[in-house]
Amino acid sequence: MTQSSLASKTGQNFAVADLGLFSELHQFTFEAPEKPIKLEGKVFLKQLLSLTSAEISVNNLPPRTSVPFYHKHRLNEEIYIFVRGTGEFQVDDCVFPVHEGTVVRVDPEGERCMRNTSDAEELCWIVIQSRAGSYADHTIQDGFGVQKRVSWVGKERL
């Protein structure tokens, strides 16, 4: 199944999609346009959710397998958030362990790859890709409170 078979629901200020369980991401295959690359267990969210500020993907790598190539970026750094499994991550000539709870940031120039070192469990992660050096604010500076009592009653349900 390709990720084009996924659908999102939208409202005035949001989009939502259900990808299913991380352990079932292997049913999706990403095929890179203009390149002979097929990646099983990878779903990009930019088109699905109409993202405007980042590319995000969710990923699943079967036991005892490796991503079959190294890659870099021209402009974007990547943040990897590991949510299940155990593996190893390689940046340039440095290899380090990753597991649930590990977070990795890689500069655009970093040559990267990873592998699943488990005999039984999938390695699952989320990747956030955004322009390096573009975020100068502190996390809370852009947000502001809304003077409204929280209520879950009488709301539209999707």
What are these model-predicted stretches?
Residues 50-52, 62-66, 86, 131-134:
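Short, charged/polar surface micro-motifs in flexible loops or helix N-caps
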